[in-house]
């Protein structure tokens, strides 16, 4: 019976092996070939993906080698792609812990996987762009990643992808429509990074919703005025009725008094 060794020592050995394969390779094809030849167990695929990102983040500047390597593994087996999808979420959630240089490299790495369609664009559902759900670090990450994608794809193709109806449910956090404040924040963010064009639909939505909100407020005010007017009218009628009744009673009393005097 084979005993699974998942001790820290074994994990360190695996990482070291992957690290040496990366450092000793002249091309991403050679590196992928070396790692695959080692025949790692499927349970270690996550370590391979994590090491690729870790080595990428350690570079002084982003090296396309790592994006190509990560993309190759994503295309080889869906298990690798799934691990990178999970790592995207983990990296984004902990992005505030990365120093700027590492953050930049990781953002460009994932931008490569996305614009090359090595990674499913559904991972972008992890991003919600509002004032309350972003930090300075996460905004820098999003900025670098989207600018990198725009550079490789072109703004027109990027815009086309972001408007794909089959993917739109995954982009609701990027272009929030839950309230005008969040919509404006997203529009201002993308405009500030030179990608205002991707928010055209959101701008139109904000314009329409603002008009509808204004009309709703006006209708409510008008309804309130009508209620006040109706209440005031009823009050006046009641007052007039009461006054008429009082006058009538007074006349009757006066008439009765006059009749009594004559007798």
Q: Can you say where each PLM-predicted feature lies in the sequence?
A:
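Residue-level signature of the C-terminal ends
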Residues: 21, 25, 34, 38, ...
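Helix-loop junctions that connect tandem helical modules in alpha-solenoid scaffolds
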Residues: 3, 55-56, 91-99, 131-136, ...
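Long, low-complexity, highly charged intrinsically disordered regions
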Residues: 1-65, 82-85, 240-248
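Short sequence/structural elements of tandem HEAT/ARM alpha-solenoid repeats
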Residues: 26-35, 46-51, 64-69, 79-87, ...
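Helix-start/N-cap signature of alpha-helical segments
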Residues: 41-45, 58-66, 81-84, 98-105, ...
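Eukaryotic acidic, Ser/Thr-rich intrinsically disordered low-complexity regions
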Residues: 1, 139, 143-144, 155-262
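Hydrophobic alpha-helical bundle architecture
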Residues: 90-100, 104-134
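Amphipathic alpha-helical elements of HEAT/ARM-like alpha-solenoid repeat scaffolds that form extended
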Residues: 13-17, 30-34, 47-51, 62-73, ...
